[in-house]
Amino acid sequence: MEGTGAPVKTKRRYDSSRRRKQALRTRDAILAAARELFLGGGYAATTIASIAEAADVSVETIYKGFGGKPGLVRAISEKGLEGAGPIPAEQRSDEMRTLKRDPYTVMQRWGAFTTEVAPLAAPIALLLRTAAATDREVASLLDELDRARLARMEHNARELFERGDFRDGITLEYARDVLWTYSSPELYEMLVLRQGWPVERYGQFVAEGMIAALLPERREQPGHNLL
């Protein structure tokens, strides 16, 4: 019969889209439940069964999707690094670094990104640091995530280095290490979690520190404020 193909294809596309959305909702529910339980009760004490119960899914669903607790923590960490916006923070950082030629503005924005990402990612990294003392698999995951952050900081520094934005004598490796230090979960822990700094003040401190460590002194225009 003529005219019967299109409606079937449309229905299949609709069903497929609905399944994908449901799968994403399920994944988000699992990660939210796992994050809350890990941070509330600790890594070792949290079981897959308790996460499944909190997320209203089966244990098998979690093992199939994440492979166990290390996979869950990796996924939670990756989600945290995306930030809170609809576009992942790393993508926004890349786009901003390309569009903004002023390195001072770039680093101010990076400081702002830390206020968005650190509250999501740092507590999980600190949780792993504690668990790594007695769990080899967690220690390996922590090392993997830390090396990935170091590589990301080198990626961030490279374009500014190649454009000649840094002070004379600043190497790519030095710039990478400065960014790595200022993005560390330990710095967030010291200033925000322990000392009670507002996260906005912490982000400003990060931006000012990176600028002072890497960029030449800026001649300010009358009425101009760096941050």
Model-derived segments and spans:
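Short, basic, alpha-helical segments at the C-terminal edge of helix-turn-helix-like DNA-binding modules
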Residues: 48, 77-84
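Hydrophobic alpha-helical connector segments
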Residues: 69-71, 75, 85-119, 176
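Amphipathic, non-transmembrane alpha-helical scaffold segments
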Residues: 23, 31, 77, 107, ...
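Hydrophobic/aromatic-rich alpha-helical bundle segments in the mid-to-C-terminal region
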Residues: 139, 161-208, 217-227
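Helix-turn-helix
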Residues: 29, 33, 37-71, 75
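Amphipathic alpha-helical packing segments from all-alpha helical-bundle domains
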Residues: 112-129, 136-163, 173-177, 208-212
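N-terminal intrinsically disordered/low-complexity leader segments
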Residues: 1-25, 218-227
